[in-house]
């Protein structure tokens, strides 16, 4: 009995130590797994993708939407778009005025590329400038019709104003192309009318009709 007791006591103590070690390992594993889950959840919210290796994480890819938004302010975007849009249409007006009968001018004015590019730019500006109050400003009267006061409030935003400018550039260039093509078809001078279409589109259209009427009366 004494010898058995002498052996069983160390064995019991060893088993107890082993059990405590196993329990500690299990606790560490549970803590590690919870850390990994928490890290992964934090990464999902933060917009990062992580790869877990030996209880550590490495940022592989991070969204830059927040950073990108801080690079340019609304005023800077509106100013840049205003300048880019204005500069983009000037070569077409220059060709129609300086060399209206040149082949390069005819080919450029037949192209739909500038209208597509400016149209996409307009859609982008419309998207980022749209607010819940936009429709309310557009149809502010009790008859669901536009009112001057509502339109003035809507265009108080620089981004909305920039989108309206791109809208005008597209419409003016399209009208100038119509005047230019009609002048080529009927052998009518259109340089003055095309020039007016750049900033005073309705005046340019009227100028073309008046010029056309004068030329037709001379040949009668």
Swiss-Prot record:
Plants over-expressing ABA4 have increased levels of trans-neoxanthin. Keywords: Chloroplast, Membrane, Plastid, Transit peptide, Transmembrane, Transmembrane helix. PANTHER family: PROTEIN ABA DEFICIENT 4, CHLOROPLASTIC (PTHR34543:SF1). It is a multi-pass membrane protein. Signal peptide: none annotated. The chain crosses the membrane at residues 77-97, 112-132, 154-174, 195-215. Disruption phenotype: No visible phenotype under normal growth conditions, but mutant plants accumulate violaxanthin and completely lack neoxanthin. Its main location: plastid. It comes from the Eukaryota. One of its GO terms (cellular component) is chloroplast membrane. InterPro entries: ABA4-like. Expressed in root vasculature, root hairs, leaves, trichomes, sepals, stamens, stigma, pedicels, siliques and embryo. Required for neoxanthin biosynthesis, an intermediary step in abscisic acid (ABA) biosynthesis. Probably not involved directly in the enzymatic conversion of violaxanthin to neoxanthin. Cannot convert violaxanthin to neoxanthin in vitro. Required for ABA biosynthesis in response to drought stress. Required for neoxanthin biosynthesis which is involved in photoprotection of photosystem II (PSII). Neoxanthin acts as an antioxidant within the photosystem PSII supercomplex. GO terms for biological process: abscisic acid biosynthetic process; regulation of superoxide anion generation; xanthophyll metabolic process. It is found in: Plastid, Chloroplast membrane. Induction: Induced by heat stress. It comes from Arabidopsis thaliana (Mouse-ear cress). This is Protein ABA DEFICIENT 4, chloroplastic. Residues 1-37 form a transit peptide. The keyword ATP-binding does not apply.
